[in-house]
Amino acid sequence: MAWQGERMATTYNNLYMDIRRQLKQAGYTGAGLEARELVCCGSGKSREEFFRDAQLYVTPEVEEKILSLVERHLNGEPVAYLIGEWEFYGLPLDISEAVLIPRVDTEVLAREAIDYIRTLGKCRVLDLCAGSGCVGLAIAANAPEARVLLGEISEPAVRICRQNIRRNNLTGQVSVMAMDAKAAPSRALGEFQCIVSNPPYIPRADIETLDHSVKDFEPHLALCGGEDGYDFYTAIIRLWKTALVVGGRLYFEVGIGQADTVLRMMRAEGFGDINVVQDDQG
């Protein structure tokens, strides 16, 4: 048994178990993953080093740093912002409060687009409202003949996209450009075989009803879709269809209860063969 002053020392594994228990009691569904990520971040260890050193004792300084992160998380701050990174479709991504945290549900959008794009061979793909670049980067990593452009209006988000392109060694396949999804595209952009978009779609009045961890930490620019939540869908469907080749495809993520309205918008603008795929949230 070891002691740190008046407090008993603890191993990395025991500290992890204690943090996991705290998070579970607080209602966090991903308590095991989040506890491990907080211990790794606070100690400066990789996941492999965490497992290797699980039975080693934690120094008081490192324990204090880890517990400070845990306290911030228990107060609502998302783990992805605390550690500065997150994973999407198997890719490690830099994350900051300038971008939304990639959700597992959005992997459905990426998967559907990837399955189609793989059938095309060489093609051009636009990820509009790219945020961290997660969807476009997943497409590029899984459809190596595609050339992907990430379009994002926020300059801090554009910087995150650049970091993630480099981090995943996709500089030869992916580029990023500042662009406004609610403005008509420049003809100089050319045409794309596929456009994917996970645009802001929360109605303005609903922002205040979101969970504290979303409302108070994630960027409202990336959440708010205008008064009714449809501003970006309206603009992209009407204005960006001109950037698609004949027969090209447009993929959206939509919010709960929005699919029928977006379908009507697309049909009104001449889109056909429209399908809806539900994620695990319905």
Tell me the role of every PLM-derived stretch:
Residues 40-115:
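Conserved AdoMet
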